[in-house]
Amino acid sequence: MSGLPHSPHALVTGGGRGIGRQIASELVRAGATVTVLGRHRAALDDAVTAGAAHFADVADVTDQAAVSAAIAAAAARQPIDILIANAGIAESAPFAKSDAAMFRRMIDVNFMGVVHAIQAALPSMKDRPYGRIVAVASTAGLKGYAYVSAYSAAKHAVVGLVRSLALELAYTQVTVNAVCPGFTDTDLVAGSIDNIMKKTGRNREQAAGELSRHNPQGRLVTPGEVADTVLWLCGEGASAITGQAIAVAGGEV
């Protein structure tokens, strides 16, 4: 498997924690210069201090102007070769109780956040000899789950964007793909487990089992497994892989 080209610059949105931080760390180990972008300065600075990234910029992915400014600042340090559009949030509720504001939150962060990052990074990336865009979607972008209709709709939109944009860019050296993790052992899923416990009275093991039962391997995915897939897609040997939505879910979907 071919690795990364020499010292590419990678920018990871939502890179201060969870899957995003793991991806950033793996990219650093593979020889990339890594900038993490997110809302919380403390988490971003901690990633830099821990060696999981080299630089950190603060921006809310729902704010197009802020994202554009942050990505321009990062590109001024070194042109961006790799964009990992990872930032996301999840909320659950029955459809009847999912109001318009909830749908807007899910779309604004999980879909428009991806759009904003790509629109800011792509123009200069297209002119470079190598470019990789990877969106972190979800198995909820490939199938439905009860009680997360807003989240699932947003993640389906990400997969549709990836498939369409890959065709537009097929003549360039830029590939566009999505990774679609199943339930992953992160603080985001820990929050979902807490929510299940609160609403159902189940203990932590039972609540975690409610999520891991979707995985044919009977477990939660690890952030490292997602990061390994992203790293493969960023490699020079993956130049023919574009427009794909790759499930990292132990056989689910």
What residue ranges belong to the model's regions?
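Conserved glycine-rich cofactor-binding loop
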Residues: 16-17
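Substrate-binding pocket helix/loop in short-chain dehydrogenase/reductase
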Residues: 94-95, 99-107, 211
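Alpha-helical segment proximal to the catalytic Tyr-Lys
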Residues: 123, 167-168, 239
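Short, small/polar-rich loop/turn modules that mediate ligand/substrate recognition or access, typified
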Residues: 170, 175, 241-243
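C-terminal substrate-recognition "lid" of short-chain dehydrogenase/reductases
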Residues: 217-248
